[in-house]
A protein has these predicted regions:
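A glycine-rich beta-strand to alpha-helix segment
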Residues: 173-177, 182-183
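A conserved segment at the C-terminal end of the G1
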Residues: 19-32
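Pre-Walker A (Motif I) flank of P-loop NTPase domains
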Residues: 2-7, 171
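Short catalytic-loop micro-motif centered on adjacent basic/acidic residues
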Residues: 83, 173-174, 227
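ATP-dependent small-molecule kinase phosphotransfer cores
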Residues: 39-170
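Small-molecule kinase domains that catalyze NTP-dependent phosphoryl transfer to phosphate-bearing small molecules
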Residues: 8-15, 22, 38-42, 46-48, ...
């Protein structure tokens, strides 16, 4: 994977990982001429003035994924060779949709959607003694992804993501959900970098599942850590931009 540069972002839930990836993606959209102007909302989501000169009548800004534009095809055919956002949990989430029948919007949605109850009961899991009732989307993702599959092979989701990056070979691959130490090391072993983010909106991360506590250990082996605990989104973006410009092989990708 000689010509693909990987940058991963590590941190707790809602630490700013997705926002960081969106900032870099928005920067590339403007640089590549996909949009004349780009910005991030207060929620860290990308807005653009246009997509390849297509606009929405009466709107100065629109979401980067408007209903009238097939953004996935845009990445498959054009943008994907320059920059693409990946997730270690991508294959897991799609599996839970395809095999367990979970709602795709909830599986790939926000925290409120992930905390929604599903049709699957804790009672179906013979080894579960303390949990009762219906499982939430988040609980299923944690159980299937970590307790089941990582129990069989701790590198299963890492390998799936890295193999996809190698297959698609974008110029810049961004990984938005680094949580475990082996995920950090996998990116570094491919010549990539991992940037840790310190923000932790929840005073006490859940102690009953390793996926909620593992990010704290990740920060110790990241290539650099940005203390974004009290930074606004624009301030975080500035720190990320300055940090990336000092990484080897990155300045040629992010101008």
């Amino acid at each position: 994977m000689s010509h693909t540069q990987i940058i991963g972002f590590a941190g707790h839930k809602q630490s700013g990982k997705n926002t960081a990836c969106n900032f870099i993606l928005a920067t590339k959209l403007a640089e590549l001429g996909v949009s004349k102007s780009t910005r991030l909302t207060d929620l860290g989501e990308i807005e653009v003035t246009d997509i390849l000169d297509e606009t929405v009548s009466g709107q100065e800004w629109m979401p980067f994924k408007p209903p009238h534009v097939d953004v996935e095809s845009l990445f498959d055919n054009e943008l994907g060779k320059f920059v693409k956002i990946y997730s270690f949990a991508q294959k897991l989430k799609q599996l839970c949709v395809d095999v367990l029948g979970l709602d795709k919007d909830f599986v790939f949605g926000n925290d409120q959607q992930k905390n929604t109850k599903t049709h699957i009961k804790w009672d179906n899991i013979k080894s579960s003694t303390k949990n009762k009732g219906y499982m939430t989307v988040r609980e299923i993702l944690q159980y299937v992804g970590t307790d089941m599959f990582r129990g069989l092979d701790p590198t299963i989701w890492v390998n799936a993501c890295i193999n996809q990056i190698k297959k698609e070979q974008p110029e810049l691959a961004l990984v938005s959900d680094v949580r475990f130490e082996n995920e950090v090391k996998a990116i570094q072993n491919e010549g990539g970098y991992v940037i840790g983010l310190t923000r932790s909106p929840f005073k006490e991360p859940k102690k009953d599942h390793v996926s909620e506590t593992a990010p704290a250990q990740c920060l110790d082996i990241c290539d650099m850590v940005i203390d974004n605990a009290s930074l606004s989104i624009p301030e975080q973006n500035e720190q990320i931009y300055l940090a990336i410009k000092h990484l080897n092989n990155i300045p040629d990708i992010i101008v």
